Design a protein with these regions (language model features):
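C-terminal regulatory/interaction module of P-loop NTP-utilizing enzymes
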Residues: 1-310
Length: 310
């Protein structure tokens, strides 16, 4: 635990998180040990979240036993924040992706045959409640009523699950749930007031240059500063275009940008890598031309891997 906490503490101090919050987090770690069978679910994410204000708001709410709802546009770091919070709290992470066909059995579990006996095959919500995990409720506004009804009792003061034919499950005191939602996307629905009232809500701001550079430097500490700044500028230019409705958010893809930069390590030219990671994410001819124009202002076609890696 000591080595694990030392790394977390350094990250929090680098983000200039208040010492009072760091102290409470340390107490949380000491109070709630992780059981051996789920220790592999506690891992440091590839990308850590950048942003003091959002981190402090999230940590404070979770320390007080509240659940979080992260709302915001694409590429604002919602899932990165979820993974980072699970890591800094030292809790096993359970990812639950909602879609129109998700029902209560997918969340809690369903009956199955084991050694000629009917037993409950535990779902992610059940396991999260049992082991004190952090449940990531991804795209929660795509959930239908059957799935939402399960969430009501676990998200409010009752903190329990009633399973017909089985015992009542009380949530482990370290259990927390973090929902994410992209508002207004196809297939999504309005969250009802009763469900929203069970969350503390954070509206995720759009990424700025510092936060994009933070992500790129985590992945590519050996990259040329000027090149990484150019890639960050490309992302921000596309973000502005998407905000004003000139393009869709398909090409506004931070994962695609990171993958494109990675591909240049294997000798692929930066412009070809960006073609795969960013430009080709749009399938509309006219939109693709706009994205290509934006790329040409930031990434010269003459660039090679040496311009990025020296």
């Amino acid at each position: 635990m000591r080595n694990h906490w030392t790394e977390i503490e350094k990250y929090l101090e680098d983000q200039k998180i208040a010492q009072e919050l760091i102290g409470e987090l340390r107490d949380f770690h000491m109070r709630y040990e992780v059981e051996d069978q789920v220790k592999e679910r506690v891992e440091k994410p590839d990308i850590l979240f950048y942003g003091k204000k959002i981190l402090e708001m999230s940590i404070a709410a979770l320390l007080q036993g509240d659940n979080l709802l992260l709302s915001g546009a694409k590429a604002t770091g919602k899932n990165v924040l979820c993974e980072t919070l699970a890591w800094i709290f030292g809790r096993p992470e359970y990812d639950i992706s909602f879609h129109v066909n998700t029902d209560s059995a997918d969340l809690i579990g369903t009956d199955t045959f084991i050694n000629n006996e009917v037993r409950l095959r535990k779902g992610p919500i059940y396991q999260c409640a049992e082991f004190g995990g952090f449940g990531i409720l991804d795209e929660i506004n795509m959930a239908k009523n059957d799935a939402v009804s399960v969430l009501h009792a676990i998200l409010d003061h009752r903190r329990r699950i009633d399973i017909p034919g089985y015992n009542r499950i009380l949530l482990h005191p370290a259990t927390r749930f973090i929902g994410t939602m992209n508002y207004g996307y196809a297939g999504t629905r309005e969250l009802n007031e009763a469900l929203v009232s069970r969350f503390m809500v954070i509206d995720m701001p759009e990424m700025d240059e510092d936060s994009v550079l933070f992500v790129l430097r985590q992945h590519f500490p050996d990259g040329e500063k000027s090149a990484l700044k150019a890639f960050a500028g490309l992302f921000l230019d596309l973000q502005i275009k998407a905000y004003h409705g000139e393009i869709s958010t398909k090409s506004l893809d931070l994962r695609g940008l990171v993958s494109a930069v990675k591909a240049t390590k294997s000798g692929l030219s930066p412009i070809d890598a960006i073609q795969m990671g960013i430009i080709n994410k749009s399938f509309d001819v006219f939109e693709k031309e706009i994205v290509e124009d934006v790329v040409s202002t930031r990434i010269p076609s003459s660039w090679t891997g040496k311009d990025i890696w020296g």
